[in-house]
Amino acid sequence: MSEVLEAPARPALANFIGGEWRPSVSGRTYEKHGPWRPSEVIGELPASDEEDVNAAVAAALAAFPEWAGLPAAKRGAILNKAADIVETRAEQIAQDMTLEMGKPIRESRAEALRMSQVFRFYSGEGLRPTGERFEQMLTGSVAYTVHRPLGVVGLITPWNFPAAIPAWKVAPALVYGNTVVMKLAQEAPLTGLHLAACLEEAGLPAGVLNIVIGRGSEVGTPLVEHPDVKAISFTGSVPVGRGVREEATRLGKRVQLELGGHNPVVVMADADLARAVELVYAGAFWSAGQKCTATRRIYVEERVYDEFRTRLLERMESGVVGDRTTRPRRSGRS
């Protein structure tokens, strides 16, 4: 069974800074090629650099006082409306996701809806009480804590989950009153541009969310180093994450990292081998293994090693390799 995916309607292939869709300051661009066919050019995108980062941070800094002063419930309401918009555009978002990074359309559709779910969940945080109250020894005295936004935060996202991970980072940052500069992965920026367009339509004020597209060394590094960026959240490889941590902590910024994993499976002799094979297969080949939770090692009890190995190889041989037009159940294998 095949399904030909048409080119979806999409936002401008541009940076999103101060509520405007902009080319890079330098005017430089790069070609985004399809993962299935390297000769397939999806579009031209801005090859941004430090000047674009500076413009985005300036826009976020200018928008921060008014956004932080807005009641949290109103910030949450914008996220809730954005969730509605994402749901109406889920198919467009899913098609662009598969087009740009190769995930089977079934997985992309689920992830597009996940973006909506994340927005919906964090919209509720705008109504949740925060802070604590502490009784004191002195009569008439009370101590309490309140939560305050940090200011401008920098978010750096990977290409393998281009809807879910940006949503996980953006939604909490916004509902708690921060403004955002986000660097999307150069390999998969289209999905994140949909995220920005949905928030813009939901009424997010200009400058609250800014997106800059480009290489890590030309966009990520100046974002981490910018003096007006108070915190960094990075998802990516261990070597790059270590560099982000060292530089951010040296500059006194808050930093959060989600780095690559190396995940094992243990198969005991009394395991249901048929189920174990399916779980290992799914863990290794969902999204072609391009995720931090993918199965990379298998430890099998010696008594069942030969049987398990034979079954797993048979399962791998039964997989179907397909491109985005053939709707494989798994990326690379199905």
Could you say what each language-model-derived stretch is?
Residues 1-44, 77, 131-156, 256-259:
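Terminal low-complexity tails and localization/encapsulation signals of metabolic enzymes
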Residues 19, 39, 75, 97, ...:
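Residue-level signal for inorganic ion chemistry
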Residues 38-129, 140:
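Glycine-rich loop-to-alpha-helix module at the N-terminal edge of alpha/beta enzyme cores
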Residues 42-48, 63-69, 155, 265-268, ...:
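Short, well-ordered beta-strand elements within core beta-sheets of diverse protein domains
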Residues 64, 68, 83-90, 94, ...:
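Structural signal for hydrophobic packing residues in well-ordered secondary-structure cores
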Residues 131-275:
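Rossmann-like NAD(P) dinucleotide-binding subdomain of oxidoreductase/dehydrogenase enzymes
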Residues 231, 239-334:
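ALDH superfamily catalytic-core signature
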